[in-house]
Amino acid sequence: MQTNTSNKKIRAVAKHIHMSPHKVRRVVSQIRGRSYEQALMILEFMPYRACNPILQLLSSAAANANHNFGLSKTNLFISEIQVNKGTFFKRFQPRAQGRGYPIHKPTCHITIVLNILPK
């Protein structure tokens, strides 16, 4: 029995990444719409700290495609990738005379959707 693989979407989600969504979006905009192999090369050589979790998530999505659908990694491209704001870690920095200044440590959620390259 032949299954229709043209409409399958492969997803991977990373939540509560300890980075600002603004800084992660700077990297994500460079790989949106590219093939899996091109995105790997771009992420390998970019000097930003946000590249590492995106690289791990991209390889996880490709492994999902291979394990769940039996698809080759060379036939995949990034159809959707989005970065959403997560929760803030709230901390206080002690200041003079008993005061405390709030510190907000941002997190983000990254979602990658891969699809099969059209022939």
From Swiss-Prot:
One of its GO terms (cellular component) is large ribosomal subunit. The keyword ATP-binding does not apply. Keywords: Chloroplast, Plastid, Ribonucleoprotein, Ribosomal protein, RNA-binding, rRNA-binding. GO terms for molecular function: rRNA binding; structural constituent of ribosome. It is found in: Plastid, Chloroplast. GO terms for biological process: translation. Pfam families: Ribosomal_L22. Part of the 50S ribosomal subunit. This protein binds specifically to 23S rRNA. This is Large ribosomal subunit protein uL22c. It comes from Marchantia polymorpha. The gene is rpl22.
